[in-house]
Amino acid sequence: MSDRIYHSYVNNFYQKAKSPKNTQLIKQIQRSNPTSPKKNLQIYKNINPFNHENCQRIIEENAIRFSDKKTVQLGTVYGCNILLTTKNSQPKVFEKLIQLSDNSNFRQVTLLKSISPVSVVKAKDFLNDSISNRSRSAQKMYSDKDKFQVGNNKSSLRSLIYFPLANIKDQISEESKSKRNKIKVIKDMPIQLDNSFQTINHQINSPNNNIVGDQSHVILHNIFKKRQQAEEGLQIQEEPQNYIKNKLELQERKMYLENQNPKSLSPIKIHFNEKSMPFKNKIQKKITYNEQSSIQQTITLIKKKILGPPSLYSRLKKNSEQFKNIENLIKNKAKESHEQNMQEYLKRIGCTDKNKKVFCINSQDQFVQEVLIELGWIENKLFKSDLFHLKWIYTDINKDYENLKEGQFYNHFQNNQELTNKGRLLRNIKLYLVSYPHLQKYFPIQFDVIYKQQKEEFLNEFQKFEIFRKFKDVIQIIKNDLTQELINQLTQIYHTKFIKKEEEEELQYGLITYFRQNQQFKQYIEYINQVNKDIINLLSKIPNPNINEMLIKYLNDLSILQVDKLECDQEQGDKNIQAQIINLSISIELDNILEQIYPYTNFCNFWIIKPCGSSKGQGLQIMSDDNQIVNYTTQLQARLVQKYIERIYICKSQEYPQLYNKKFDLRLWVLVKSFNPLTVYYYKHAYLRVCSSEYDLSDTRNIFSHFTNYSINRNKFIQNKNVEDSAISLKLLKHIIKKEHGISYQKKIQPQINEIIIHSLKSVQKKIKQNNSCFEIYGFDIIFDEQFNPYLLEVNLSPACSKRNEFISKLQKEMFISTLNILFNTEYYQIQNWKKIKIQDQIQKVINESTHTQLQEEVILNSNNFQSEDSEERFISAAITIQKWYRQIKLMKNENQKI
């Protein structure tokens, strides 16, 4: 397709984009049945090139039409806008999308033919997640000039993937239409000296970047389309002051070039406008980088341009100390320029006090604005301005991090979604636990079922808990009928059998007499035998059953018991009862082991389903049927499946009506001042989030008794006129634990919570970009089991909740004042409630406890497959071998008897 035809097509596309005919066009698409890509192009060319906002608007306007799940699905995938229509709904929507994203060849879009539309409510979630999951392989698709229509014409699916376009009249220059095909970068878009194809691609694929924007067409048309002409070089025309504007960026460019492979960089040619050159004529007018030139030579040329003529640069290079001093002067000059700009701003608004602080805010946290104004700060209402000392934004964008200077503070870190997004946090935690598996005790079992492997792992885990549930039911009945003395004797038999035969027979004598008198136990024993066989068979079929080492001894003993049982089958009487007693003793021991391994569950097999990108309790469900869970997570955007903490701590004392028989969790504020080195504080005065109804595990549909989110319980609290009970001070829980159970919260529980905080942050430390001007406050949600063991539920972004009662309002203001005292080294109101966590002590403790080597970690990470330990596989193969051996012995005995 020639440039002329392409631009005429784009002009026609854009002129009709804003016409209010979207609904009619969609109807036309539904009625049509195109037979060729060319005809498809004629139908689709008038559709608005949806950006993020337009997509949501059209979904809302056509909510009634889309709710029947048979018509249209809208979304944005891999930098393209996509509209899918199909006659027949088919399952596994998101699984197909993931297969597509993992595939290096983007042209295999025919996989989309099996995708079915989803409801309106979940179309928004699909849109949000798809923007943040774009693949680099999209550039291969863009390099193909002629493929605007991708799909299978023979199927009922009619899909279109097209370029996101912008207003060409304002952006496309005359030079871009010429035959030379040079790239003219618009002046409004800053291009840095180290800009390459990868850098521009990263800008386009940024999660916070609107694909349909002022620069998107120029970038896609002039860079992606001409990627095949890379050998001719990308020619960038730009005025020098745009990239020499901030000399502090020299170090960043140097680090970028040093870390890149020369062959992976596109050729870059930088042309200077000779008339606007601030340097002398002796300096070269052109910097050229190609694959033959080394990285160091390029860095040298860059430094020559910034530091001056070659003679001056060579003298500075010889004296390294003087060179470092100049770099320090550059930093100091940048700091001075920021302070000068702030003083000029204060003078411009009529403020005579040069020490006044300025803040920008665009957030729902009203307490921030109230506290700063009370402290005498001045608000810059242009929250996108660079003139501030503190910027407080609800959600960040990548552009906010570009021009941060020393002395400024911004309340987010770049890539914080790695910690606050439920799906990304799960992946990071799992990778981290590969090196430190003993930390699994702080994180409930959880799976992202959108991935095929994790979906299979979830089903295996569900089956394992289901068979354990059946076992617990029957063993509980037996325990209720047995006295504690008999249970102790059975436990003693388990620990002494196969060691001292005389003592074992002596212990069994009383039990044999008891079993003879109670014939009902024969039914219990038969049921236990069947359950034990089911356990062995189930675990032998599961590839990675994730068996704890404590279970290995039990299951091997159970297999060995089958030899005695086979021998006793030939002889009735006491020997048979003796084998049954041993079997029962092993089963009781298994019950004790399960209590230790899974202290947070009573094996009801409840699982909680969570959407990845939602907040405020949206989309939460509790289910106990594996088929129902799989169907729910496949059709909707609820991807995460987490084991429900069933045996939580519930206050049973009526002295404390705020917590009596109600579920609660802990919301703990955590301040991260730096990720490298890791500097972390936790807020001492945390609070409890309490449910509005009493806890009842038999009724999982009552959301008011199982979810502590205030957005869920708000109306219930208002109706009951007890909003004050929605959030309670942690001091009350400390008092209850100390008085009722004799446990010190500060000595037993707080150290474990510190471990959860540190290792959660360590799991994402390499993925979050460090910036000395950034800080962030996270909300860690933690729940306790009956033994007061803490578990991390999730980590929240911007966790300072809205006003609900006086206690929370006071807590928010004190927390924020304490934050200001740490950031600006002040002493406002003498308040400091942040307590620093000793990082090195926690890390060293984990290293000492870890048994994994660095080599094992690398092997597992490279395979990207979380396998179980080798001991489990050896156990399963051994158990199967023992069972085969039993059968052979039995056959041999039967044959000998016949002879």
From Swiss-Prot:
Location of the TTL domain: 471-835
Record PANTHER family: TUBULIN MONOGLYCYLASE TTLL3
Record-given protein name: Tubulin glycylase 3F
Major subcellular site: cytoplasm
GO CC, alphabetical: cilium; cytoplasm; microtubule cytoskeleton
Function text: Probable glycylase which modifies tubulin, generating side chains of glycine on the gamma-carboxyl groups of specific glutamate residues within the C-terminal tail of tubulin.
Keyword annotations of the record: ATP-binding, Cell projection, Cilium, Cytoplasm, Cytoskeleton, Ligase, Nucleotide-binding
Molecular function (Gene Ontology), one example: protein-glycine ligase activity
Residue numbers binding ATP: 642-645, 663, 665
EC number: 6.3.2.-
Subcellular location as annotated: Cytoplasm, Cytoskeleton, Cilium basal body
Top-level enzyme category: ligase
Effect of deleting the gene: Cells lacking TTLL3A, TTLL3B, TTLL3C, TTLL3D, TTLL3E and TTLL3F display shortened axonemes that are resistant to paclitaxel, indicating that tubulin glycylation changes the lattice properties of axonemal microtubules. Axonemes are however normal at the ultrastructural level.
Cited PROSITE patterns: TTL
Alphabetized Pfam families for the sequence: TTL (PF03133)
GO BP annotations, alphabetical order: protein polyglycylation
